């Protein structure tokens, strides 16, 4: 499978919030925890900064990553959504995840994750954490996805947490 076919597989086989709406949202962290266990808890191999809020998460995340990189750290950055290419979501020191890594990850792990029926965000989060661990980042800046206590990025144990402006609707009941 090449990169374009891998993306088609991901976009068409894994429920994606931008395409199917709230039905892509998975209640609970069971899939996230199963993926995390399968990959050996990769998020425990690097420090993390968790960024949440209503507006400005992406800008805040990119700024934090740039500051840390300038300070000499090897920095992972995980944001969503992407604007042009899927690889924008997962970066190390500003460089997008290689196409080959995305293809290899899906080909190698497909038999494990297909029966779980993870959401697009659950799977891409697992891919990001695995990539950051494989590439030995010092710190990863992780942008919250849909938010709330059941957001799959919440498995990280961040050193600092950053919240941008919060509005009342951001409580998500939790």
Q: What is each residue range found by the language model?
A:
Residues 158-162:
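Inter-motif core of Ras-like GTPase G domains
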Residues 57:
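Conserved lysine of the Walker
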